[in-house]
Amino acid sequence: MVNFNQFLKQAQTMQKKMQEAQEQMANTRYTGKAGGGLVEIIATGKGEVEKVSIDASLLKEEEKEMLEDLIKVAFNDAKQKCDSDSQNSMSGALSGMSLPPGFKMPF
């Protein structure tokens, strides 16, 4: 039988580790690039875009559609890096916690 007090202590430890991981993620910046660096987006761990850099060579009317695509690719690149880092951080926060039989976490 699982010791309930021990389980609660583990849950509190896990909660603290997850909060620390979330704070670290919020303070991390991710850079997404597209078009060989012609478009660059810097996003926070919360998924907020902080900066968009566009090479001057793309600022032509005939390049509008390509520029729009590159911005989308750069943003998705930054978001993928953030999501991957978030998954790794949460996995680390949960490591070592023994859960009761049949109890599954949502991630």
Curated annotation (Swiss-Prot):
Broad class of the protein's primary localization: cytoplasm
Pfam families in UniProt: YbaB_DNA_bd
Stated name of the protein: Nucleoid-associated protein A1I_00660
Subcellular location: Cytoplasm, Nucleoid
HAMAP family reported in the protein's UniProt record: DNA_YbaB_EbfC
Database matches in PANTHER family: NUCLEOID-ASSOCIATED PROTEIN YBAB
Region of interest called Disordered, as start-end residue ranges on this chain: 81-107
SUPFAM superfamilies: YbaB-like
Organism from which the protein derives: Rickettsia bellii (strain OSU 85-389)
Biological role: Binds to DNA and alters its conformation. May be involved in regulation of gene expression, nucleoid organization and DNA protection.
Record keywords: Cytoplasm, DNA-binding
Subunit structure: Homodimer.
A Gene Ontology term for the protein's cellular component: bacterial nucleoid
UniProt keyword annotation of GTP-binding present: no
The keyword DNA-binding appears for this protein: yes
Similarity comment: family membership: Belongs to the YbaB/EbfC family.
GO MF annotation terms: DNA binding
